[in-house]
Amino acid sequence: MSNPSYPHLLPQIRALADAPGEIRIQRIRADRWIGYARAEAALAAMDDLLTFPKRTRMPNLLLVGPSNYGKSMIVEKFKRAHLRNPVDAAEGAISVPVLKVQMPPAPDERLFFAAVLEALGAPDRNHDRLAVKQDMAMRILRATDVRLLVIDEVHNILSGSRAQQRRFLNLL
């Protein structure tokens, strides 16, 4: 480009105009946040859930929309805004306010708790019984003070039988 001032560009973009092609391409391919009204409302609702006082039946939120409408991006933005906080470096304890878990392709409790353990960075032994996995996941969730559990692709519950769906919903 021959004009170094680029008055038609936003100030934060002007510096990229003369950057090498690889850098400009990388910037173009990066994720972008577009804060439309419903996305901002979803973020506000999740913030409200995060600060909700503990009680027996905690409220929940379900983000619903067609594919490629940005549901996962909303969750990712929220998660990035609430990153892990070191609590006690000497003991290695951390606080994980928001934990995002990918729902397994079917409503399988063992796979779900394996996904929770993986998201927490905990070891998971495939041969462990469901009760062992569940106990370990619950202990680590409490120890890391997880305030909000986000389950992405929760509609995968529907791929199971009615009995599997009910059992999994009861688990949640």
What are the functions of these language-model segments?
Residues 1-59:
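A short, basic N-terminal segment
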Residues 80-91, 122-124:
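Post-Walker A helix-loop "phosphate-sensing" segment adjacent to the P-loop in P-loop NTPases
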Residues 57-59, 105, 124:
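Phosphate-binding site recognition
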